[in-house]
Amino acid sequence: MSASPPSFLHSLKRLSLVTQIVIGLIAGIALALLAPEVAKSTTFIGKVFVSALKAVAPILVFVLVMASIANHKHGQETHIRPILVLYLLGTFAAAVVAVIASSLFPSALVLSTHDVAISAPGGITEVLQSLLLSVVDNPVSALMNANFIGILAWAIGMGVAIRHAGETTRTVLDDLSNGVTVIVRVVIRFAPLGIFGLVASTLATSGFNALLGYLHLLAVLIGCMLFVALVMNPLIVFWKIRRNPFPLVLTCLRESGITAFFTRSSAANIPVNLELSKRLGLHEDTYSVSIPLGATINMAGAAITITVLTLAAVHTLGIAVDLPTAVLLSVVAAICACGASGVAGGSLLLIPLACSLFGIPSEIAMQVVAVGFIIGVLQDSAETALNSSTDVLFTAAACMAQEDKAQAA
């Protein structure tokens, strides 16, 4: 009998993170149904998880962005410029789609705003002024106060400067980036417990209407991703190759998207995309560079996640959003998305940066991140499927357009 608990814990540990999150979600719902008073006491578990996310997010953004820029190879983009343009265009278009969808179908979240001062910006002018002041903030102050705009600015500046440093310095920075990533993975491993506490306490306190709110949010997210995959991306591909894009689009979704949906990792799907590119007869020197690069910067799904969840928080808090600010959010979301690769829940951890545009404090932004983890079982799978399938789709479109141009000449 004494061996049973360790055996059970060992079996639970061997399950995938997705399965553990589902178990945490179901357990939280069950506890809220069967023992609401006990469920309310699990608030502390959720608070610890959210606090851990708040702790790692600033240093994560700073180190990852700085290391990414510092280790970027000179001249790499010259071989794949048309594909790079498609990657950036597709990511920005996805953010715009998310802004429009969030305006048409606004989502409301259950957020705790007690003892938190919220100062909504008055318009694009005030947003830009605040943005500029955030950019020139002291780097130590930016890290301490989770000023993500300031963190991003200093990370970009330091990354550009360190590009001219010695190889040893850049290697150390890359190792530091890997170290931070390991810490983030440890925090993410506690997501099932954190989600259990958040779901149980939220449902016990706010009732099951909160869960219905998550379903609406998930529908908006998945709807945006389907629209981008089946409407926006085909339009971009048609603009590039000037013929029916759907055979290529459906092939990429079937051969790459389905695999990525279940692996939930763009990096893990790189071999699948390389093999598909080879079968499509694409130029090896092109796809061998563009596919790994796409897994890093082609993040349409991440742009949708960042935008929809940020605007859900904005709508919940009653903050008005004018058109110029919405456009600025699309740009920021696209830039943030490019830095979301390689980290579990990367797009969710960059939501506070987008929220800071609207004067939403880190305490509330991290509650939005926690909501993202609750719906992440489906959201992250759909996001990865869109991201990874689009890598090979845009690579194929650019190669086909180049071949057509060469034949015409």
Curated annotation (Swiss-Prot):
A Gene Ontology molecular function term for this protein is: neutral L-amino acid:sodium symporter activity
One Pfam family, short name: SDF
Q: Where are the transmembrane segments?
A: 15-35, 49-69, 82-102, 142-162, 193-213, 218-238, 301-321, 331-351, 357-377
Q: Which InterPro entries match?
A: Na-dicarboxylate_symporter, Na:dicarbo_symporter_sf, Ser_Thr_transp_SstT
Catalytic activity as recorded in UniProt: L-serine(in) + Na(+)(in) = L-serine(out) + Na(+)(out); L-threonine(in) + Na(+)(in) = L-threonine(out) + Na(+)(out)
Matches recorded under Gene3D superfamilies: Sodium:dicarboxylate symporter
Which topology term describes how it sits in the membrane?
Answer: Multi-pass membrane protein
GO BP annotations of the record are: serine transport; threonine transport
Q: Which GO terms describe its cellular component?
A: plasma membrane
For this UniProt record, give its keywords in alphabetical order, as a comma-separated list.
Amino-acid transport, Cell inner membrane, Cell membrane, Membrane, Symport, Transmembrane, Transmembrane helix, Transport
State its location(s).
Answer: Cell inner membrane
Task: Please tell me whether the keyword DNA-binding is annotated for this protein.
Answer: no
The protein's job, in short, is: Involved in the import of serine and threonine into the cell, with the concomitant import of sodium (symport system).
Family listed: Belongs to the dicarboxylate/amino acid:cation symporter (DAACS) (TC 2.A.23) family.
Xref: NCBIfam families = PRK13628.1 (NF010151)
Question: By what name is this protein known?
Answer: Serine/threonine transporter SstT
Its source organism is: Pseudomonas fluorescens (strain ATCC BAA-477 / NRRL B-23932 / Pf-5)
